[in-house]
């Protein structure tokens, strides 16, 4: 799939709030003598494409032939966008082009200074006419709304109506609590907070998620209904609710992740990719982006690299793991086992375990430990091979090998929040249960076990 997509160059039109993201990198190592505030010494500045322009950059990085339509002011930021984007921009005199200046110190954002004009544009009719003139040449349209006055109700309704008449998919990254101006679009990509505001729901937990996502589809006549759920992935409603789980390994900065999601979805729909597969690829793109700092674009090569996991990076000693966990404010899930011949039952079990928290740690019995528990003929695979196989799964965050007969010492050392065991432990004592906040028992898939697989192989000889 990635190989096919990386060779495509679909023509995609993007309209919306084009901005400039400026990063001012500073040294903040002293306090001002004038007041109890930090002194920021500027080291360098980095001007980047932001808002709809970042979606443009993502689409271009993916290989699309992108064309931008928008309205900018007669200012330096407007000139920067015109110089760096292929497209046509209407100039509204006196209007401020959105400019966000992020003050960065020690890889942390400490302040943001915004220059912008959020009033509705005066050039609605001209923008609609320009769209009508260009639209027939494109495979998909993206409306990137940051509530800066470009995508007014009049503009949105006219653009969606025209594209729909030509059977061209329209994808919208919405803003605000009133989604009615986007009615008839192919899909919207609100995050959880935006969806809650539009739906007037208190939460989107449990059954409310399906009710809410279905209501969005029906109320706004969408082809597909999508809600991005941050670390929980992407929820999709076509004929039923499906969840494409998130795949981020490390999160440094969520800036621009939504732009990457809609860019990948647009690229995929322009090439006829099935919608759930498109959501899975969008998740992978977001995972790449949140591992970087600032508004950045993503390419198919980076997505390919993300899928090629460096197994050894996820295999840690308990000491390394404890240091890493101290740096994260995450819900830690722990399970353990021999995992000698990894099978379908193991995969489903670990996938379910991951859903219970943020970080899944698998405690793996060492070769010596497996021999004690299973006999001299085991393990079939070495501890390193078994650790690599487990680390290959995106839902496993870390693997730690232990020599003891039970994981009690390891659990005491790491102090996870949730301890997961198989449902066969229902009437048994779970080692480490008194150390953790919660024990969860997960049903195994029927008919799968390492012992049975070994017996089957022996019988065939």
UniProtKB/Swiss-Prot annotation:
Alphabetical list of InterPro entries matching this protein: Bifunc_HldE, Cyt_trans-like, PfkB_dom, RfaE_dom_I, RfaE_dom_II, Ribokinase-like, Rossmann-like_a/b/a_fold
Keyword Nucleotide-binding: yes
Protein name: Bifunctional protein HldE
Ribokinase: region residues: 1-312
Assembly information from the UniProt record: Homodimer.
Single Gene Ontology BP annotation: ADP-L-glycero-beta-D-manno-heptose biosynthetic process
Catalysed transformations (reactions): D-glycero-beta-D-manno-heptose 7-phosphate + ATP = D-glycero-beta-D-manno-heptose 1,7-bisphosphate + ADP + H(+); D-glycero-beta-D-manno-heptose 1-phosphate + ATP + H(+) = ADP-D-glycero-beta-D-manno-heptose + diphosphate
Pathway: Nucleotide-sugar biosynthesis; ADP-L-glycero-beta-D-manno-heptose biosynthesis; ADP-L-glycero-beta-D-manno-heptose from D-glycero-beta-D-manno-heptose 7-phosphate: step 1/4; Nucleotide-sugar biosynthesis; ADP-L-glycero-beta-D-manno-heptose biosynthesis; ADP-L-glycero-beta-D-manno-heptose from D-glycero-beta-D-manno-heptose 7-phosphate: step 3/4
């Amino acid at each position: 799939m990635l190989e096919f997509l990386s060779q495509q160059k679909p023509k995609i039109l993007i309209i919306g709030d084009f901005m400039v993201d400026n990063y001012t990198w500073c040294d903040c190592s002293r306090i001002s003598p004038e007041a109890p505030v930090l002194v920021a010494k500027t080291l360098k500045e980095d001007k980047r494409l932001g808002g709809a322009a970042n979606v443009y950059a993502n689409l271009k990085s993916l290989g699309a032939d992108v064309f931008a339509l928008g309205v900018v002011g007669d200012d330096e930021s407007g000139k920067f966008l015109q110089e760096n984007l292929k497209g046509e921009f209407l100039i509204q005199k006196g209007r401020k082009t959105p400019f966000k200046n992020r003050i960065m110190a020690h890889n942390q954002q400490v302040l943001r200074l915004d220059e912008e004009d959020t009033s509705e544009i005066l050039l609605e009719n001209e923008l609609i006419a320009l769209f009508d003139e260009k639209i027939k040449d494109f495979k998909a349209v993206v409306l990137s709304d940051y509530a800066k006055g470009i995508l007014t109700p009049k503009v949105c309704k006219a653009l969606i109506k025209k594209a729909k008449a030509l059977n061209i998919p329209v994808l919208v990254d919405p803003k605000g609590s009133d989604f009615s101006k986007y009615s008839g679009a192919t899909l919207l990509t609100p995050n959880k907070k935006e969806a809650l505001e539009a739906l007037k729901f208190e939460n989107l937990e449990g059954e409310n998620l399906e009710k809410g996502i279905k209501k969005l589809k029906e109320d706004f006549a969408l082809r597909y209904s999508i809600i991005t759920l941050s670390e929980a992935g992407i929820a999709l409603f076509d004929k039923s609710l499906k969840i494409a789980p998130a795949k981020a390994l490390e999160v440094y900065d969520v800036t621009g992740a939504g732009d990457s999601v809609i860019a990948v979805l647009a690229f995929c729909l322009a090439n006829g990719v099935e919608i759930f597969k498109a959501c899975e690829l969008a998740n992978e793109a977001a995972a790449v982006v949140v591992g970087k700092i600032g508004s950045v674009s993503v390419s198919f090569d980076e997505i390919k690299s993300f899928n090629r996991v460096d197994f050894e990076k996820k295999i840690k000693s308990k000491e390394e793991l404890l240091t890493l966990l101290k740096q994260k404010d995450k819900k830690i899930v722990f399970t353990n086992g021999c995992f000698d011949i990894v099978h379908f039952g193991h995969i489903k079990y670990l996938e379910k375990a991951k859903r219970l928290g943020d970080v899944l740690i698998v405690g793996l019995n060492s070769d010596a430990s497996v021999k004690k528990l299973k006999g001299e003929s085991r393990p079939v695979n070495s501890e390193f091979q078994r650790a690599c196989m487990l680390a290959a799964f995106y839902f496993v965050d870390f693997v730690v090998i232990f020599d003891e007969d039970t994981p009690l010492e390891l659990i005491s050392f790491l102090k996870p929040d949730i301890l997961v065991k198989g449902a066969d432990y229902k009437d048994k004592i779970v080692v480490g249960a008194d150390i953790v906040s919660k024990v969860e028992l997960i049903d195994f898939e029927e008919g799968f076990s390492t012992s049975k697989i070994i017996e089957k192989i022996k019988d065939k000889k």
